[in-house]
C-alpha cells in the first residue's frame, strides 16, 4: 500500500511538470531570437516560392519623390514575381526575393506632398470708390485719343500734298493746258494753187523712153485720180490747222478736200487693186538683143585695114578684098589721115617700152564689129543669152 501511494505521488508530480515545460516552450517560440519560429518562416517561404497563375501583380504606390506609379503585372516569361522595396518595385524570377506588399503603407498620398491650396482672396465689394483716381484715368484716356486723332489728320494731309505735287497731277494740268491751246483761232482762207489742176492726171514714172509699170507690191503711197497732186514749184505750206471741236464751220474748199481724201483712203483700204484695174499700165516684155549673124574670122584683116589706128608695123595683105559687108560699110567713107604718132611709129617700128607688146587700137565706130565674132562664140559656148549691164539710168541698157 505504501509503495502504491509513493508511485501515485510521483505521477502527480510528473503531471504537474508537463504543463510547465509546455509553457516554457511556448515562451521560447514567441521570442525573436529563439529557434521555435523557424518552422513558421519555412512555411511562409515555402508558400512564397510558388508564383500565382498569370504572374504576380505589383500594386500601385507613391515613390520616394511623391510620384504615383500605376500598378503592373509580372507576366513576362520567368519574371513572374514582384520584388524590390516599398518605394521601388520591379519584376524578378527569384521567388525568395518576393516582396510582401501587405507590409507597405505608401499606398496613400504622403502628408508632405499635400501642401494645400492657397486661400481665395475675398473681394471687398463694400469698399468705397475713389473719385480722384477715376478722374485721372479718364484724363489719360482723353489725352491718348486726341493724340491719335492728330496723328491721323497729319498723315492724311501729307498724303494729299504728295498726291497734289506728284508728276501725275502735273501731267493732268499739262493735258488741260494742251486742250485749251488746241482751240482754233480765226481761220484764214487757203491760198490758191500755183500750178494747173492735176485732178484727172495719173503720174507714171518713165525713163529713156521706156515705160515702167508700177508694181502692185510697191511701198509708195497710192493716189487715186480724184486726189490732187502736190505742185512741183515751192510754195508756202498748206497744212490745215488743229481742229478742236466739230461745232466750228469749215471752209468749203477744205471740206471738199477732206471729203475727197477720206473717200480716197476708204477706197484704197477696201479695194486697193481697183486703181490698177481702172488704169492699166503698159508692161514691157523681156528685153532681148537682135539676132546677129556670126562673121567668119577672115573678115578681121579687112576691119583692121580700114581702121585708121592700126597697130604699128601692120601691113595689110596684098590681094583682093572679099566682097563682104565691110566693103559696103567702108566704101562711102573718106580715108582719115594718120596721126603724127603713127607716122613716127612707122618710121621706128621698135616699141618704146621693152617687155611690153604694142597696144592694138581700134576706132570707136569699128569697136562693136571687131568683137562681134568673139561675143557670138562666147554666147554659143556658154549656152545663155545676152548679158544685161546695170547702169545708173532708169532704163536698163543691154549690150
UniProtKB/Swiss-Prot annotation:
May regulate trafficking and current kinetics of AMPA-type glutamate receptor (AMPAR) at synapses. InterPro entries: Shisa (IPR026910), Shisa_N (IPR053891). Residues 1-36 form the signal peptide. Residues 389-399 have a biased composition (Polar residues). This is Protein shisa-8. Keywords: Glycoprotein, Membrane, Signal, Transmembrane, Transmembrane helix. Interacts with AMPAR subunits GRIA1 and GRIA2. It comes from the Eukaryota. It is found in: Membrane. The chain crosses the membrane at residues 137-157. Brain-specific. Highly expressed in cerebellum and olfactory bulb. Residues 37-136 are extracellular. Residues 207-248, 378-399 are annotated as: Disordered. Glycans are attached at residue 73. Belongs to the shisa family. The keyword Ribonucleoprotein does not apply. It is a single-pass type I membrane protein. Residues 158-399 are cytoplasmic. GO terms for cellular component: membrane.
Amino acid at each position: 500500500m505504501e509503495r502504491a501511494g509513493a508511485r501515485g505521488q510521483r505521477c502527480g508530480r510528473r503531471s504537474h511538470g508537463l504543463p510547465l515545460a509546455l509553457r516554457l516552450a511556448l515562451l521560447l517560440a514567441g521570442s525573436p531570437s529563439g529557434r521555435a519560429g523557424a518552422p513558421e518562416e519555412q512555411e511562409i517561404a515555402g508558400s512564397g516560392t510558388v508564383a500565382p497563375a498569370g504572374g504576380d501583380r505589383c500594386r500601385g504606390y507613391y515613390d520616394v519623390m511623391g510620384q504615383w506609379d500605376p500598378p503592373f503585372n509580372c507576366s513576362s516569361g520567368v519574371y513572374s514575381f514582384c520584388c524590390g522595396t516599398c518605394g521601388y518595385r520591379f519584376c524578378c524570377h527569384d521567388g525568395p526575393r518576393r516582396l510582401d506588399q501587405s507590409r507597405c503603407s505608401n499606398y496613400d498620398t504622403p502628408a508632405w506632398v499635400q501642401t494645400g491650396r492657397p486661400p481665395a482672396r475675398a473681394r471687398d465689394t463694400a469698399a468705397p470708390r475713389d473719385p480722384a483716381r477715376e478722374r485721372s484715368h479718364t484724363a489719360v484716356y482723353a489725352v491718348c485719343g486726341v493724340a491719335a486723332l492728330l496723328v491721323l489728320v497729319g498723315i492724311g494731309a501729307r498724303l494729299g500734298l504728295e498726291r497734289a505735287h506728284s508728276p501725275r497731277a502735273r501731267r493732268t494740268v499739262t493735258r488741260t493746258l494742251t486742250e485749251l491751246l488746241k482751240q482754233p483761232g480765226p481761220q484764214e482762207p487757203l491760198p490758191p494753187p500755183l500750178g494747173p489742176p492735176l485732178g484727172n492726171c495719173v503720174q507714171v514714172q518713165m525713163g529713156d523712153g521706156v515705160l515702167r509699170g508700177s508694181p502692185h507690191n510697191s511701198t509708195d503711197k497710192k493716189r487715186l485720180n480724184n486726189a490732187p497732186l502736190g505742185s512741183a514749184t515751192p510754195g508756202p505750206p498748206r497744212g490745215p490747222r488743229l481742229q478742236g471741236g466739230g461745232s466750228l464751220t469749215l471752209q468749203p474748199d477744205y471740206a471738199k478736200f477732206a471729203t475727197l481724201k477720206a473717200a480716197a483712203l476708204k477706197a484704197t483700204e477696201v479695194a486697193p487693186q481697183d486703181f490698177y484695174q481702172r488704169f492699166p499700165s503698159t508692161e514691157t516684155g523681156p528685153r532681148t538683143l537682135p539676132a546677129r549673124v556670126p562673121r567668119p574670122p577672115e573678115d578681121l584683116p579687112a576691119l583692121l585695114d580700114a581702121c585708121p589706128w592700126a597697130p604699128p608695123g601692120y601691113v595689110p595683105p596684098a590681094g583682093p578684098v572679099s566682097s563682104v559687108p565691110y566693103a559696103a560699110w567702108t566704101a562711102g567713107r573718106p580715108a582719115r589721115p594718120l596721126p603724127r604718132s603713127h607716122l613716127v611709129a612707122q618710121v621706128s617700128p621698135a616699141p618704146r617700152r621693152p617687155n611690153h607688146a604694142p597696144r592694138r587700137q581700134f576706132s570707136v565706130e569699128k569697136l562693136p564689129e571687131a568683137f562681134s565674132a568673139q561675143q557670138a562664140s562666147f554666147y554659143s559656148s556658154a549656152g545663155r543669152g545676152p548679158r544685161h549691164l546695170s547702169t545708173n539710168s532708169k532704163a536698163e541698157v543691154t549690150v
